[in-house]
């Protein structure tokens, strides 16, 4: 009885989390194979998904994942940008192989490709966006698990989990719940105990937010200590050079001493002010042959 109450409380907590992440919000269109999972339709035309059936399908998918011995035989793939971070985190904690981004055609069918693989299970985010791997998995008899919205095609999907596969919070919440259920069934996490990994790690983050977070996490350096450090090349290094490294030819200083007898008078010095111009030098007397007076003047 206690285990049933604990399971019921866990289910209620998971459903509340899915409601907060808007997992229950579908689209205005509904595929005929998804009508069994629809709870009701709002006045604005949006279909509401029954989260009780979503939780049951998550448990079924977790049992299928645990039944595979080697986790590397499981491929988790998402071409939708909102699901790429969640796919990588899911693969990190469960040991599966993640493919985040565009699917290379022929990965499951062309044996000549270097990226060829034959997985035992394929987990996808959106059957409409990931239509190529679904078709290749059908050709290779690979079972497929996919998160299906109300308008998603169910062809070639073996286990369809009804949920909102277009919101970044919804996709992260679904992969977090699936990873926690897998770890609980493997015995890594005890039943009824809280998983220490937060669901926020599975959410999509904008590149600008990631860059700002990395800049905030950088430690602030002590620049004052760097300036107070010893100078490059201390004073002892200048005297440490031996004299043998210098050349043998020593340049003698020029003899600049001039005897006092050879000094000459310098020219006139300029005025005290900067704007005062120096007086031109007076020319010396020039010897001219002047005739002697004759008395007629």
Swiss-Prot record:
Q: Disulfide pairs?
A: none
| InterPro entries found in the cross-reference section | Ribosomal_uS2 (IPR001865), Ribosomal_uS2_CS (IPR018130), Ribosomal_uS2_euk (IPR027498), Ribosomal_uS2_euk/arc (IPR005707), Ribosomal_uS2_flav_dom_sf (IPR023591)
Q: Name one GO cellular component term.
A: cytosolic small ribosomal subunit
Q: What is a GO molecular function of this protein?
A: structural constituent of ribosome
GO BP terms in the entry: ribosomal small subunit assembly; translation
Q: Does the keyword Ribosomal protein apply?
A: yes
What keywords is this UniProt entry annotated with?
Answer: Cytoplasm, Ribonucleoprotein, Ribosomal protein
Q: Which PROSITE patterns match?
A: RIBOSOMAL_S2_1, RIBOSOMAL_S2_2
Cross-referenced Pfam families, in alphabetical order?
A: Ribosomal_S2
What residue range is the signal peptide? none
From the UniProt record, list the coiled-coil ranges.
Answer: none
Intracellular or extracellular location(s): Cytoplasm
Q: What is the role of the protein in this entry?
A: Required for the assembly and/or stability of the 40S ribosomal subunit. Required for the processing of the 20S rRNA-precursor to mature 18S rRNA in a late step of the maturation of 40S ribosomal subunits.
Q: Which PANTHER family match?
A: 40S RIBOSOMAL PROTEIN SA (PTHR11489)
Q: What family, per the record?
A: Belongs to the universal ribosomal protein uS2 family.
Q: Provide the assembly information.
A: Component of the small ribosomal subunit. Mature ribosomes consist of a small (40S) and a large (60S) subunit. The 40S subunit contains about 33 different proteins and 1 molecule of RNA (18S). The 60S subunit contains about 49 different proteins and 3 molecules of RNA (25S, 5.8S and 5S). Interacts with ribosomal protein S21.
- NCBIfam families assigned: uS2_euk_arch
The entry's protein name is Small ribosomal subunit protein uS2
Q: What is the lineage of its organism?
A: Eukaryota, Viridiplantae, Streptophyta, Embryophyta, Tracheophyta
Gene (UniProt): 179B
């Amino acid at each position: 009885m206690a285990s049933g109450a604990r399971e019921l409380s866990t289910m209620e907590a998971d459903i509340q989390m899915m409601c907060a992440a808007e997992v229950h919000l579908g689209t205005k269109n509904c595929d005929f194979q998804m009508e069994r999972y629809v709870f009701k339709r709002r006045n604005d035309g949006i279909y509401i998904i029954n989260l009780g059936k979503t939780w049951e399908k998550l448990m079924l998918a977790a049992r299928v994942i645990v039944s595979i011995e080697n986790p590397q035989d499981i491929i988790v793939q998402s071409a939708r940008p909102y699901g790429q971070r969640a796919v990588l985190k899911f693969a990190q904690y469960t040991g599966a192989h993640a493919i985040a981004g565009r699917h290379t055609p022929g990965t499951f069918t062309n044996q000549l490709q270097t990226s060829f693989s034959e997985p035992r299970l394929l987990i996808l985010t959106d059957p409409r966006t990931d239509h190529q791997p679904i078709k290749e998995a059908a050709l290779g008899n690979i079972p497929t698990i996919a998160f299906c919205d109300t308008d998603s095609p169910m062809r070639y999907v073996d286990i369809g989990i009804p949920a909102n596969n277009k919101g970044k919070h919804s996709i992260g919440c679904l992969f977090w719940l699936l990873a926690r259920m897998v770890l609980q069934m493997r015995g890594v996490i005890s039943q009824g105990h809280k998983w220490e990994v937060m669901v926020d790690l599975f959410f999509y983050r904008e590149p600008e937010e990631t860059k700002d977070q990395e800049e905030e996490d950088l430690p602030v350096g002590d620049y004052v200590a760097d300036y107070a450090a010893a100078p490059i090349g201390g004073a002892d290094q200048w005297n440490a050079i031996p004299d043998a490294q210098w050349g043998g030819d020593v340049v003698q200083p020029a003899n600049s001493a001039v005897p006092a007898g050879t000094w000459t008078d310098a020219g006139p010095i300029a005025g005290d002010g900067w704007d005062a111009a120096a007086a031109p030098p007076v020319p010396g007397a020039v010897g001219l042959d002047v005739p002697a007076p004759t008395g007629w003047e």
